[in-house]
Amino acid sequence: MEHFISIRDIGKKEILNILEEAEKMEELLNSEKHSNIMNGKILATLFYEPSTRTRLSFETAMKRLGGTVVGFTDIANTSVMKGETLPDTIKVINGYADLIVMRHPSDGAPRLACEYSNIPIINAGDGSNQHPSQTMLDLYTIKREIGHIDNIKIAFIGDLKYGRTVHSLCHALSFFENIEIVFIAPKELKIPKEITDDLDNKNKLYNNNIKYSETGDIDLTGMDVVYMTRIQKERFPDLSEYQKVKGTYKLTREHVEDKDLIIMHPLPRVDEIDISVDELPQAKYFKQSFYGVPVRMAILKILNEKNKNKKSEI
């Protein structure tokens, strides 16, 4: 794994390796021992779009491993505003850092960046396309809170059209056995056909008994996992279309308090989960956010080890 751009670039072996390494990183965090795994290394965080959890958890992960962080969170203060191209920015950063984490509004921008980089690049989200480190912490949450990833029934609710976390997680789940998925969304935000086609293809390839269905109604009977998403206002080309679907779904105590399941959400939350749900034992979205640190520690460690002998050609 030279870069980490899409969950589609890795297989089940690599996924399990990251999960195993994340367990070790969580143990390290709980032990409060100091790590120097990334001592002397610099992580550059290039965030062309806003971020709270992803950026801060990557920065925390790097510092917990003994490394340091440089970067930007607002392109208004960078040479991008002067017309600097992405390839030029990447070439420059290659001379400053050992790894790059980047978020960009354009689908495919991190993959383009890889063509101009001699150091590992991690995709922290590109448009409505991919968010692979979020996928890994989602899988890690399921494994830690349920005990296994195989043999689960999961409901995805909300913005399934623009929700890159949903797209990535569906692909990752396709490597596991006996997964049943229920897509719950308004017709305007239904899961893209390319995602369901991918599930069909994986089912034929691995014969791992993946099932899925689509509906507009919330019925959580028999679910192991509920994965809520916000309606992503910033992705709508027409604001009037957003107004039609905003507030379509709101998860309440009545939906879940008598059910044996876990509730996940990639955050930020707007109004799709009532705050009264927060105190229920089923609510795991803040724990899910915490798991981002050991998972991203694992990703940084693996990429650093894989690329430690690769020297910059600049």
From Swiss-Prot:
GO molecular function: amino acid binding; aspartate carbamoyltransferase activity
Binding site for L-aspartate: K82, R164, R230
A UniProt-annotated Pfam family: OTCace_N
UniProt superkingdom: Archaea
EC number: 2.1.3.2
Biological process, per Gene Ontology: 'de novo' pyrimidine nucleobase biosynthetic process; 'de novo' UMP biosynthetic process; amino acid metabolic process
InterPro entries: Asp/Orn_carbamoyltranf_P-bd, Asp/Orn_carbamoylTrfase, Asp/Orn_carbamoylTrfase_sf, Asp_carbamoyltransf, Asp_carbamoyltransf_Asp/Orn-bd
Transferase found in the keyword field: yes
Residues involved in carbamoyl phosphate binding: R53, T54, R103, H131, Q134, L267, P268
PROSITE patterns: CARBAMOYLTRANSFERASE
Keywords assigned by UniProt, alphabetized: Pyrimidine biosynthesis, Transferase
Biochemical pathway: Pyrimidine metabolism; UMP biosynthesis via de novo pathway; (S)-dihydroorotate from bicarbonate: step 2/3
Catalytic reaction annotation: carbamoyl phosphate + L-aspartate = N-carbamoyl-L-aspartate + phosphate + H(+)
Family: Belongs to the aspartate/ornithine carbamoyltransferase superfamily. ATCase family.
Oligomer and partners: Heterooligomer of catalytic and regulatory chains.
PANTHER family recorded: ASPARTATE CARBAMOYLTRANSFERASE (PTHR45753:SF6), ORNITHINE CARBAMOYLTRANSFERASE, MITOCHONDRIAL (PTHR45753)
Family annotation (HAMAP family): Asp_carb_tr
Protein task: Catalyzes the condensation of carbamoyl phosphate and aspartate to form carbamoyl aspartate and inorganic phosphate, the committed step in the de novo pyrimidine nucleotide biosynthesis pathway.
UniProt name for this protein: Aspartate carbamoyltransferase catalytic subunit
Source organism: Methanococcus aeolicus (strain ATCC BAA-1280 / DSM 17508 / OCM 812 / Nankai-3)
